[in-house]
Design a protein with these regions (language model features):
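Positively charged, low-complexity intrinsically disordered regions
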Residues: 20, 113, 117, 131, ...
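Non-catalytic, beta-strand-enriched accessory regions in extracellular/secretory proteins
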Residues: 42-73, 78-82, 92-94
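Extracellular/luminal beta-rich ligand-recognition
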Residues: 100-139
């Protein structure tokens, strides 16, 4: 009976990891990415990545970059963790490149277009480049997305979809906020649509990603419980196995063949 319970626990942990594998692959920002020269590189913009960050004021700007071929599809979305203090947080998402234009975009979100020599952006557009800025102009609160593995919910904001990028080269995604309502808050930048998890990721990426997400949502109780279970459950299994082996040894000693 106890062996069955242990197997069931391992099965639940494994299937929970599988649920997360049907989602964004976490991409951590370790160093500063506060200008074009230090932009965080997205290895493959087609892979489904999730970047969890926080803007700390109207002058805080985050930069990301990726390489693409002509005709590639681009998908990017801003989501906000469902915490009441971020309910009105609506950061902007910009795409900067040499020849992108608002006409390349799909969808019905508010779009602003800038050349390098004009604009009210909190960053300077490099010479020879242009920027399109997609803002969220929908209802607040916006539609929600529930992530089952971490038991967390997000408010979905704007999407940026380009079915065919105009040229080969380096593209920059820039996240910033100039809102008069709320200029500080946490966001998730999702890029790409192809889910790409290996077996190794189940053990090297997914467990710490679960922990990081809980901290991102300021949930410090769940990690404490999870860590306690990781310590207690193996200990109980070990104690059970030791006792069982001891009983077998004593039985053989008392009733030798």
């Amino acid at each position: 009976m106890k062996e069955t319970i242990a197997i069931m626990i391992m099965f639940v942990l494994f299937t929970s990891s599988f649920q997360m594998a049907n989602g964004h692959k976490p991409l951590k920002v370790v160093d500063s990415n506060n200008d074009f020269s230090t932009a965080k590189e997205i290895p493959n913009h087609k892979i489904s990545w999730g970047i969890y960050e926080e803007l700390r004021g109207s002058n805080d700007v985050h930069y990301y970059k990726f390489g693409a071929d002509e005709g590639d599809r681009l998908y990017a979305q801003i989501s906000i963790p469902k915490l009441e203090k971020f309910s009105t947080f609506v950061p902007s998402l910009a795409l900067v490149s040499s020849d992108v234009s608002a006409g390349n975009l799909e969808g019905g979100y508010s779009v602003r277009e800038y050349a390098h020599d004009i604009g009210d952006l909190p960053f300077a557009i490099p010479p020879g480049m242009r920027a399109i800025v997609v803002d969220y102009n929908g209802p607040i609160p916006s539609s929600e997305f529930y992530e089952p593995f971490t038991q967390t919910s997000y408010w979905e904001r704007q999407e940026m979809v380009i079915n065919s990028l105009p040229s080969v080269g380096t593209y920059y995604l820039v996240v910033f906020d100039r809102s008069l309502v709320q200029d500080e808050g946490k966001y998730t930048l999702a890029v790409g649509e192809i889910e790409d998890f290996s077996l190794l990721d189940f053990f090297t990426i997914i467990p710490p990603a679960w922990l990081d997400t809980k901290f991102f949502f300021e949930d410090y109780v769940s990690p404490t419980i999870a860590i306690s279970l990781l310590v207690v459950v193996p200990s109980l299994i070990t104690i059970f196995l030791v006792k069982r082996l001891k009983r077998r040894y004593q039985s053989k000693t008392l009733h030798p063949r």
